[in-house]
């Protein structure tokens, strides 16, 4: 092998390996510091494309989960109102029973409370009096539709005014009572309670449907997140071993560059 000054092939090759090893070391540091296997498209273009699609699906499902959570809260508030209505109607029935006591000297002592309770019931029939984030809780004109992933779920906004009437042709209106005597019989109370109970049953069924939808969406989010992680996340143990290897290679190649440069000093010795 000839000895030259202008060309140092050994040093050139060692420098090339040093640059390559240093680049690999930098890549390993990037992966460990970010926790990602893919830090730029060149690492795995196909994997990056798949992970972006998965992330988009996850984001959409998380939005659906928020929609479902809000719908569940809506139903919980709605049921609270229906429960209050049930309690008021039961109290009216109690007042009716007490007014029928033959030992009572008249029923007028209950009239004031009956009128007050009836007025409270009447407030529930006005949709704008009962809202959740600006949305009417009780509105017979329309229902709501919640998008839960791939399915749509209907949320009922009940006709509470009709539920608070009983008797033939809905002649007994519990939102317009002024006297305990306006309550025809205990059967009227029972009829209205049954009607309100049906509304609460519908509310509960819709809430259960939303809970199942939430569980389904949560499962999808978990599975998609795991799939994305398998593509994007770095194996810390394996990458740590690779980092140690690259550090040794960088040190070794740097030492070889120095050795290759020193080898040409022999030519100077010959020229002396």
Locations of regions flagged by a protein language model:
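Short alpha-helical H-box segment flanking the phosphoacceptor histidine in two-component systems
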Residues: 235, 248, 252
């Amino acid at each position: 092998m000839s000895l030259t000054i202008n060309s140092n092939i050994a040093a050139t090759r060692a420098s090339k390996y040093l640059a390559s090893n240093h680049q690999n070391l930098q890549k390993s540091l990037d992966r460990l510091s970010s926790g990602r296997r893919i830090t730029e498209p060149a690492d795995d273009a196909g994997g990056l494309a798949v992970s972006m699609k998965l992330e988009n699906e996850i984001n959409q499902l998380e939005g659906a989960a928020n929609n479902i959570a809000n719908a569940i809260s809506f139903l919980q508030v709605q049921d609270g109102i229906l429960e209050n209505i049930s309690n008021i109607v039961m109290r009216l029935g109690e007042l009716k029973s007490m007014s029928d006591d033959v030992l009572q000297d008249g029923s007028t002592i209950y009239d004031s409370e009956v009128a007050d309770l009836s007025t409270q019931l009447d407030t529930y029939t006005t949709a704008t009096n009962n809202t959740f984030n600006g949305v009417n809780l009780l509105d017979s004109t329309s229902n709501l539709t919640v998008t839960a992933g791939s399915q749509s779920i209907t949320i009922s906004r009940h006709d509470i005014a009709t539920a608070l009437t009983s008797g033939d042709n809905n002649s007994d209106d519990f939102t317009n009572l002024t006297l305990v005597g306006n309550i025809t019989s205990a059967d009227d109370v029972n009829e209205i309670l049954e009607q309100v109970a049906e509304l609460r049953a519908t509310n509960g069924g819709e809430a259960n449907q939303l809970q199942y939808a939430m569980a389904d969406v949560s499962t999808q989010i978990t599975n998609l997140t795991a799939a994305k992680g398998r593509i994007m996340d770095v194996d810390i143990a394996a990458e740590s071993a690779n980092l140690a290897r690259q550090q040794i290679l960088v040190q070794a190649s740097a030492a070889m560059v120095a050795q290759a440069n020193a080898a040409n000093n022999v030519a100077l010795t010959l020229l002396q």
